[in-house]
Amino acid sequence: LPRIDQIINAAAEHDSLCFLDAYSGYHQIKMAESDQAATTFITPYGPFCFNTMPFGLKNAGATYQHMIQTCLEKQISKTVEAYVDDMVIKTRHVETLIDDLRLTFGNLRTYDIKLNPEKCIFGVPSGKLLGFIVSNRGIEANPAKIRALLQLDIPADLKHIQKLAGCMAALSCFISRLGEKALLLYRLLWRTEHFVWTDAAAAGLDEINTLLASNPVLIGPNIGEPMLLYIAATHQVVSAVLVIEREVDGYKFPLQNPVYYVSTVL
């Protein structure tokens, strides 16, 4: 399967987006007659088997991905990105949207792939894709994930800290020097006894919440575009960020835009 981060980067910073949903997903792929018996299941009315690919098969996702990439081969990485049954048509200029749609629909029709119109969205400036928000601004965190973190109660035990750490991990690429800000929180994960929530730990969490509430935005690099790597290291934490410099109208010097943050507690 493709890397999710590559799909997200490629879909961001476009003027218009169309999100497509295939009708019944995997069931649009027919099973080979010789393999149908392997999908047999028992019901009160006797045994039945699938004649189309069911959900749950080990290679179902990869098989569906292969079908979509074959169908949209000439558009993948150009005007279309696809991750299994999540497809997005990306248009740099609104004027070419209809042409991009016409080409995509023609390719889907060639392979008899049907879409669910109730779940398709056309010509929008932003939308949710694979757990992120992509728009012409760049890549933003899913607001639902941010709300989940902001609404967590003050941790009272190890289980609560583990839940908090999980929420932060899902948003880590948006948080500068996360390891330093959350160091005291991570240390609580190592303790099995004498759990104590301190003011210093609360201050670190407040700093993270404030940063996320500001709606940070990442951008995706273009092929061949130079990037800068900044590293900050202490004896406890190593943090880094990939940055791209781009010229912006009205500014004398190029602006630095973050691509991805990483942080590791030693």
Where are the language model's segments positioned?
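Hydrophobic (often cysteine-bearing) scaffold residues that line and stabilize catalytic clefts
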Residues: 4, 19, 60-64, 80, ...
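Active-site palm subdomain of RNA-directed nucleic acid polymerases
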Residues: 61-99, 174, 178
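Mobile genetic element proteins and their domesticated derivatives, centered on retroelements
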Residues: 7, 21, 41, 56, ...
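Amphipathic alpha-helical blocks
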Residues: 8-44, 115-117, 160-184, 233-235
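C-terminal reverse transcriptase regions that engage the nucleic-acid substrate
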Residues: 78, 83, 118-225
